[in-house]
Amino acid sequence: MIGIIFNTYALYKIFCYEQFGFKKNQFIIFLVFNLLSSVIVFAYIFSCGLLYCLPYILCAFWLSGVAYADYVSCNVYEIMEYYAVIPILLSILNIINNGTSYALPKLGAALVTVAAYGIMAKAGVFGEGDSDILSAVCIVYFDAYYNCIFFGLVMVLFVIRNFGYAVKNRVMHGNVRPLVPSIYMGYILMLPFVLGSTPES
């Protein structure tokens, strides 16, 4: 409930904050475009019987909007970071309601892992956006082998991100924000769902 109240207040600040002007409108248009695209994807998934992966594809669309906001305004990006938790909650609810192949102990372990990702993100091991993507995917692919791969990918992307900031500071003189590939890794992790794989029973 506290999280819902905080996110509602954050949404109010985003849409009522006039400082961003035209750039803020660009971000809103881009986000609406992503949401409309997700409706099309929803129709396709429903016809193919792959409804369970909808929240994760929505997560990819949502974080792509966050990535765009990163280039529009740091302030918007910092606020929108907290919104990535919404697809994760949808994913958990989807599993509880429809994921008959998930045992409760497995779901509990997945939730613990999600919390661990969040704590590590706050500790600065990797970005909060990375934590959100990994948490959502981990709920489906909760396996030690996949987790090791995820941690390895995140650590590599963490190095790339810091290298990007170094390039920005030395070459771009702070005028252009570097590409943060860790957010876009969500699309790579969504491929198994798009290709029609199913969670293990």
Spell out what each predicted region is.
Residues 1-201:
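A membrane-topology feature that recognizes alpha-helical transmembrane segments
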